[in-house]
Amino acid sequence: MNSIIKRYKVERKDIAYLRYTIESYDGAAVVVTEDPAIAIIRLMISPLCENIVDELISSFVQDESLNIQEI
């Protein structure tokens, strides 16, 4: 199975928090910082976990008011 790749523009201060939280969902996704200077992250998502990761990203935006934009 191939990973689903999604890229996001986030706030730099949130990168570590996002990585820690997303990767705590064992096997759901791996977070890579593509460009720390402009805070671009790449998620490599397990196809079976895409809905979980999408819901998690939505929760970050709605419940925690994080600025996350898919690019």
Region locations from a protein language model:
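C-terminal structural segments of small proteins and small subunits
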Residues: 42-71
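Short hinge/gating elements
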Residues: 3-7
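Amphipathic, hydrophobic secondary-structure cores in small proteins
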Residues: 8-53
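Absolute protein N-terminus
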Residues: 1-2, 71
